[in-house]
C-alpha cells in the first residue's frame, strides 16, 4: 500500500490536504498507567521513523503525553535531516502545566511554546485545547482566556487549524456552537461498539468543521486478542461487551478478515470523518495498520455486523 488517502479537508492547510489516517503518539510517550504497557525511547523513535517511511505523515501528539516525552521523541525524528524530506503535518494540544489544573490564556501560550520547542518547529498545523471538559466552559471562553489565546496564535500564523480535542460529547458540542472551531477531535465515541458521536459528526459537517475520529479500536479491545486482556476506553471491559467482541472475532473469522481491519475501516471509509487517529506502539504495528487499511472487506460482513450492532448503539 502507498500513502494513505488524502481527503480534501474542509479547510486546507497551505495547500496540504489532510490524510485520512493520523499517527496517534500517546503510547509513544511511555504511558503505562494508561495503556498497561510502556514504550521506551528507542522503540518510539523507530516507530515514528517507520511511520514516515510508510507514508504516515500526519502525527497527533500533546503537551502532556508522557510529560512531553511524546513530543520530544517526535522532535528527535523530525530533526533528522528534515525528516528525510517528508512533509509532516503536526497536531498538538494545549495542556495545563504538570501537576496543575489551570488552562488560561497565559498557559495556552506557554504550552504552545513548550510543544514547539520539543518538536523543533516554529508552527503547528493543528492546535487543540485538550480535554476541555476538565475546565469550566465559561472560564475557557471569556475574553482573554484560553479560546482567545488559541485564536491569537492562529492570527499570528503560529498555528493552522484550531479546535478542541476530548471525549465528552456534550462539551465538544458547546465549543462547536461557538462558531469558532475549525476542527474537533473526539475519541472512543465512533466505533463498532459505540456510535454516539454521530449527531456531533453530522453537525460538524453541516458547520464546515473538520471532524477527526480518534481511538477506532476503542483503546485496544477491537484490535487485540481477548486473551491479552485488552482495555475498553482505558478500563476493563464488562462481560457483556466481551461477549460482543467475541462474536465480532468469530464473524470476522468466517470471512477471513481481522477484526482490527473492520474496526479501522468503519472510521476511515466514512466520508464525514476527515482523519482517523490510530495509536501505534511499535514499528510492526505500523505495518499491520497499513495492511488493515488496505484490506478488502466483503459487504456481506459489514451488513451482518450492522444488523447485530447498529440497533445497540447511538
Where are each of the predicted segments found?
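Active-site groove signature of glycoside hydrolases
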Residues: 116-136
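Conserved, mostly hydrophobic/aromatic
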Residues: 23, 44, 59, 74, ...
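Short, well-ordered coil/turn segments that N-cap beta-strands
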Residues: 16-21, 55-57, 84-88, 121-125, ...
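A short, structured active-site edge motif that brings together acidic residues
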Residues: 86-99
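Short, acidic/polar
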Residues: 37-51, 103-118, 168-174
Amino acid at each position: 500500500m502507498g500513502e494513505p488517502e488524502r481527503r480534501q479537508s474542509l479547510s486546507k492547510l497551505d495547500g496540504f490536504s489532510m490524510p485520512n489516517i493520523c499517527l496517534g503518539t500517546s503510547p509513544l510517550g511511555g504511558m503505562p498507567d494508561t495503556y498497561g504497557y510502556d514504550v521506551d525511547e528507542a522503540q518510539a523513535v523507530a516507530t515514528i521513523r517507520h511511520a514516515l517511511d510508510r507514508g504516515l505523515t500526519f502525527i497527533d501528539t500533546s503537551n502532556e503525553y508522557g510529560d512531553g516525552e511524546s513530543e520530544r521523541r517526535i522532535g528527535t525524528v523530525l530533526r533528522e535531516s528534515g525528516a528525510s524530506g517528508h512533509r509532516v503535518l503536526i497536531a498538538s494540544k494545549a495542556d495545563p502545566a504538570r501537576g496543575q489544573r489551570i488552562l488560561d490564556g497565559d498557559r495556552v501560550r506557554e504550552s504552545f511554546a513548550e510543544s514547539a520547542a520539543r518538536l523543533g518547529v516554529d508552527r503547528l498545523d493543528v492546535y487543540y485545547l485538550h480535554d476541555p471538559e476538565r475546565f469550566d466552559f465559561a472560564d475557557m471562553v471569556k475574553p482573554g482566556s484560553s479560546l482567545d489565546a488559541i485564536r491569537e496564535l492562529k492570527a499570528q500564523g503560529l498555528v493552522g487549524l484550531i479546535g478542541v480535542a476530548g471525549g465528552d460529547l456534550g462539551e465538544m458540542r458547546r465549543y462547536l456552537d461557538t462558531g469558532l472551531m475549525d476542527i474537533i477531535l473526539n475519541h472512543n465515541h465512533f466505533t463498532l461498539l459505540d456510535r454516539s458521536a454521530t449527531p456531533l459528526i453530522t453537525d460538524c459537517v453541516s458547520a464546515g468543521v473538520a471532524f477527526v475520529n480518534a481511538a477506532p479500536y476503542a483503546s485496544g479491545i477491537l484490535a487485540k486478542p481477548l486473551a491479552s486482556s485488552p482495555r475498553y476506553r482505558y478500563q476493563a471491559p464488562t462481560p457483556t461487551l466481551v461477549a460482543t467482541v467475541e462474536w465480532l472475532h468469530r464473524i470476522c473469522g468466517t470471512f477471513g478478515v481481522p477484526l482490527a481491519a473492520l474496526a479501522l475501516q468503519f472510521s476511515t471509509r466514512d466520508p464525514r470523518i476527515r482523519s482517523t487517529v490510530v495509536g501505534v506502539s511499535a514499528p510492526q504495528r505500523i505495518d499491520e495498520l497499513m495492511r488493515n487499511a488496505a484490506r478488502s472487506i466483503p459487504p456481506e460482513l459489514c451488513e451482518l455486523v450492522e444488523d447485530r450492532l447498529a440497533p445497540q448503539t447511538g
